[in-house]
From Swiss-Prot:
Biological role: Cell division protein that is part of the divisome complex and is recruited early to the Z-ring. Probably stimulates Z-ring formation, perhaps through the cross-linking of FtsZ protofilaments. Its function overlaps with FtsA.
Record lineage: Bacteria, Bacillati, Bacillota, Bacilli, Lactobacillales
BP terms from Gene Ontology: division septum assembly; FtsZ-dependent cytokinesis
Pfam families: SepF
Keyword match Transit peptide: no
InterPro entries hit by this protein: Cell_div_SepF, Cell_div_SepF/SepF-rel, SepF-like_sf
PANTHER family found in the cross-reference section: CELL DIVISION PROTEIN SEPF
Entry protein name: Cell division protein SepF
Membership in a protein family: Belongs to the SepF family.
Gene from which this protein is expressed: sepF
Places the protein is found: Cytoplasm
Presence of the UniProt keyword Cell division in the record: yes
Subunit-level organization: Homodimer. Interacts with FtsZ.
Length: 187
């Protein structure tokens, strides 16, 4: 509207004779106001006052609903934290019998599971092949692969640390007689 008035005033500046005609046209379209000006001002102000409390109540309702949702979310997070404390870590024990069982163990590693692998049911050549495959997967997934015994290996995801020194120290304190048993018992 202001832009339109600016252009009218610009044209009116150069055309002095038509200014009176424009003012006369504006007067012809205006309606005479029978009511007093004070009464008109009161009626226009009253609806504005009624709309403002409605907006405030909407805002209050929004803030109350947001507070309620926030409270519910906090309760949900608290229950989730309690459940996380209860969850125990498990280690899957696998006895692969052939090389084709290796991808299954890699899938467990992808699911952040720790796997204790016992190669006692595989030939030495297949066990080395399988171990090579698992070592490649471990390096790609940034996991850990530790030797536990002659035929057992522990494959863990990146978020699990293994302190193998305690296991080695425990093996040396048992005595010389236990270290002579290097054969595996087949089940």
């Amino acid at each position: 509207m202001a832009l339109k008035d600016t252009f009218k005033n610009l044209f009116n500046y150069f055309e002095v004779d038509e200014v009176n005609e424009v003012e006369e046209q504006a007067d012809a379209y205006s309606m005479p106001n029978d009511r007093p000006k004070m009464r008109v001002a009161n009626t226009t102000v009253a609806p504005v006052r009624e709309q403002q409390p409605k907006v405030e109540t909407r805002r209050e309702a929004r803030s109350e609903s947001q507070l309620q949702r926030l409270h519910e979310r906090q309760q949900e997070l608290m229950t989730n934290n309690n459940e996380k404390e209860i969850v125990k870590t498990t280690i899957d024990i696998k006895f692969p019998k052939r090389y084709e069982d290796a991808p299954e163990m890699v899938n467990l590693l992808l699911d952040n599971a720790s796997i204790l692998i016992d190669f006692q049911y595989m030939s030495e050549q297949q066990a080395r092949r399988c171990l090579d495959y698992l070592d490649g997967a471990r390096s790609v997934l940034s996991g850990n692969l530790k030797k536990v015994s002659n035929t057992m290996w522990l494959l863990t995801p990146v978020n699990v640390t293994v302190n193998i020194e305690e296991l080695r120290n425990a093996g040396t304190t048992t005595g010389v007689a236990d270290s002579n048993f290097e054969f595996d018992i087949k089940r």
